[in-house]
Amino acid sequence: IPNGDSIVLVENNALCDSHIVYSYLSNILSQKYNSKIYSYNPNFFNNTFRKLIFYIKIFFLFSYRYIYFSFGVEKNIIPKHNNKNEIEKKFNEVKNKLKSKKDIYDINLKDINVGDLVYDGFLRKYDLPTINFNTKIFEEYLKNFIDLFYFWFDFFSNNKISSVIVSHTVYEFGIVLRLAIKNKIKAYSAGSFFIFSHDEKNNSIF
């Protein structure tokens, strides 16, 4: 059993057919880098009902968490909100630079371009054809995105990550992937019928 201090991060989700691939890939990476395997939730539990259901499933052994434990995952990382004042400050810095919706694509956090993740993620979440960046709903989404980014930025800064496995390279899912790429960490997207390796020239499967 690998006992190093580094971590393989594998996304925690309900994509049952992908779990077999995650199992093999995470264990290969764990052996290669002598790393522990941690799973992670890619987003916050902003919905209290969803959070309650998550823990009820764990209690009654209905959770996919036990599938992850079966292939060596030691713990699951759930994002936590940062200091509100700090996030508000960072949000205002970003928002004040937005003069048109095209500027959204230029959003950079810690020298990482995440504008496309914000743009596409917002449209997907609210099923909208386009963005009005002056609406409260977009501002709340952007603030939440920035909060999530800085949780993962701090996690990468405070832990030794050897590799990451994500389900998607877009929306909020792409945050962990891009942080890994920025830090020269081996990054993969994987599913039931594919495994892609990613770097600075190839941060998406599209």
Where are these regions (language model features)?
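Short alpha-helical
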Residues: 16-17, 171-174
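Short N-terminal targeting/anchoring amphipathic segment
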Residues: 3-9, 156-169
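Glycosyltransferases and closely related glycan-assembly transferases
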Residues: 27-31, 156-163, 175-186
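A short, glycine/small-residue-rich beta-strand->loop->alpha-helix junction that serves as a flexible
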Residues: 11-22
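Conserved N-terminal ligand/cofactor-binding loop architecture of enzyme catalytic domains
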Residues: 1-11, 28, 32-146, 192-206
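Beta-rich, aromatic/charged-enriched effector core domains that present basic-aromatic interfaces
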Residues: 165-167, 174, 181-206
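Well-ordered alpha-helical segments embedded in enzymatic catalytic cores
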Residues: 144-154
